[in-house]
Amino acid sequence: MNLTEIKNAVKAQFPALQAVPTRFRAYQLGNAGASFSYFDGKTFTKIEARLTDTSRPSLIEELRVNKRTRIDTLHITSWDRDHCNHSELLEILQTWMPIRVEYPGYEPSTECGKACKVAIEKYCAKVADRKGVAITPTYIKSLNPSAHYGYRDVVYHPKTLVEKANDNSTVKLFRTGCFNVLSLGDVESEGIAALLKACKTACNEIDILILPHHGADNGFLTGDLLDELKPKLAVCAANNSNQYGHPAPMIRALLNSRGIHVA
């Protein structure tokens, strides 16, 4: 067999171990909030429904670089305005027409959140190939168990819905590319941290950690959790230059003491 034949044989034997062109980007918004994208060579995922005059050119350029004309999946972790802004959501839906919208499974309590949920439901109902997915405990239970070191995303939470809205944020590991990104929304519960520490996939496959609640010091992110998850890079969604007090000094110290770079 020549080299090409050997490579093809290995790919056929081990399809889950193939290299995948992958890009992750954090967007500056010019104000408080979170906005990211993850591209695995096939699927372009926009994380959070935020779009400003500052971030729009960067998103357009990222789509162009990845040769995409639309967003494949819009993933929203929380109904809070800094994660899902109604007017910005409408522009994203109308301009880049996501095929799939993953949105929080808890009921929004604010007028902005309620308007966003209605807009998503109307958008998905208009065209047959658009799919809206509420990330509820029932939805998570319907998913197949994750395979260790496989190219399939893992949704960890919400396992149950609680009174505290922040702890109903969606927790998802994006791992369809050649590196993996853990998105934590605004979670604060020590119980959710314990869930992650008990998960073999989470403890062995995280490359990039999006800091929960914009890097706030709320008791969730501890040294023990970082020691288990072992991220190579932490990303803080707070625009830039430690604006809005994020990440908090204690969180920055925890990361620095473990050699985890903060972006």
Identify what each model region corresponds to.
Residues 81-95, 111-121, 221-224, 247-249:
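Metal-dependent catalytic neighborhoods of phosphoester/phosphodiester hydrolases
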Residues 53-103, 198-216, 230-234:
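Active-site metal-binding motif and surrounding structural segment of the metallo-beta-lactamase
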Residues 2-16, 99-167, 233-263:
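Binuclear metal-ion centers of metallo-dependent hydrolases, dominated by the metallo-beta-lactamase
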Residues 1-70, 131-208:
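Core dinuclear metal-dependent hydrolase active-site scaffold
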Residues 31-32, 54, 78-84, 107-111, ...:
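Active-site environment of divalent metal-dependent phosphoester hydrolases
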Residues 55, 59, 85-88, 116-120, ...:
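Stable alpha-helical elements in mature extracytoplasmic
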Residues 27-28, 38, 78, 101, ...:
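Divalent metal-coordination and catalytic microenvironments
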Residues 48, 104, 184, 212, ...:
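A cross-family glycoside hydrolase active-site/sugar-binding cleft signature
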